[in-house]
């Protein structure tokens, strides 16, 4: 399940919902269980988008030289930032907002949920904007030690997530819709496609290295293609 947060894998809440609905599929279920741990669900939070304090950036090439917040334990994020000529700066969930407010980073990837307590223009700057292009998906994976619970407990919890997948993802959609429209900035289809290609190249490197689970990456690509057949890795787009 850790691969669900992989760069460029889950582009929206619909794909996250479709993944949740498959948690009790026999082929998938056996991959969620090992001797010591069992993945029983994921709480969707929403897509992580670039938050920046300037309106002068609208193209990938303009990211060169920018300081972008990344998680220290996430090498693919760091590689992606370096690939556009930007500088990765280590942050964590407890200090990312403070680093952004104190101008220690120029760009902060974040889910909208993390921005809702703030007035973006007042707390971050008058030109603050959110790029309407998902870098990754943010969710809270629920992992248990199966030996500490009754038999089939994990399956029952996964069944709950399957049954409530629409409710859970609707909540994430509501959070994203809560952000006023004037903060969102769209990028061109050409820019999105260029960035998708770059993200996929780096992601596939980490699949080959074993950092990402190849099975789940392929599964999520198939789910993405169902939702967006135009995505360049989908058969219909070729």
From Swiss-Prot:
What name does the UniProt record give this protein?
A: Probable solute-binding protein AdeT2
Known InterPro entries for this protein?
A: AdeT1/2 (IPR045758), TRAP_DctP_sf (IPR038404)
Explain the purpose of this protein. Answer: Mediates antimicrobial resistance via active efflux. Contributes to resistance to antibiotics such as chloramphenicol, erythromycin and novobiocin. May be part of a tripartite ATP-independent periplasmic (TRAP) transport system.
**Record-stated family:** Belongs to the bacterial solute-binding protein 7 family.
> What SUPFAM superfamilies does this protein's entry cite?
Periplasmic binding protein-like II (SSF53850)
The consequence of inactivating this gene is: Deletion of the gene results in increased susceptibility to different antibiotics, dyes, detergents and disinfectants.
Keyword annotations: Antibiotic resistance, Transport
Keyword Acetylation among UniProt keywords: no
> Which biological process annotations from GO are given for this protein?
response to antibiotic
């Amino acid at each position: 399940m850790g691969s669900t947060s992989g760069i460029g894998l889950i582009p929206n809440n619909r794909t996250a919902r479709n993944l949740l609905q498959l948690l009790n599929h026999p082929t998938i279920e056996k991959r969620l269980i090992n001797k010591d741990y069992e993945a029983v669900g994921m709480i969707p939070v929403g897509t992580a988008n670039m938050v920046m304090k300037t309106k002068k950036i609208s193209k990938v090439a303009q990211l060169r030289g920018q300081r972008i917040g990344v998680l220290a334990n996430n090498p693919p994020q760091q590689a992606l930032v370096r690939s556009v000529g930007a500088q990765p700066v280590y942050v964590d969930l407890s200090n990312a907002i403070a680093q952004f407010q104190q101008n220690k980073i120029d760009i902060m990837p974040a889910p909208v949920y993390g921005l809702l307590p703030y007035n973006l223009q007042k707390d971050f700057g008058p030109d603050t904007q959110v790029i309407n292009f998902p870098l990754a998906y943010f969710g809270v994976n629920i992992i248990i030690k199966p030996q500490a619970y009754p038999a089939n407990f994990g399956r029952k919890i996964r069944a709950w997530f399957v049954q409530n997948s629409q409710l859970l993802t609707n909540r994430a959609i509501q959070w994203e819709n809560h952000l006023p429209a004037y903060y969102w900035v769209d990028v061109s289809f050409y820019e999105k496609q260029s960035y998708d290609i770059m993200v996929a190249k780096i992601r596939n490197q980490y699949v080959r290295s074993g950092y990402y689970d190849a099975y789940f990456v392929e599964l999520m690509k198939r789910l993405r293609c169902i939702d967006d057949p135009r995505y360049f890795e989908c058969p219909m787009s070729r």
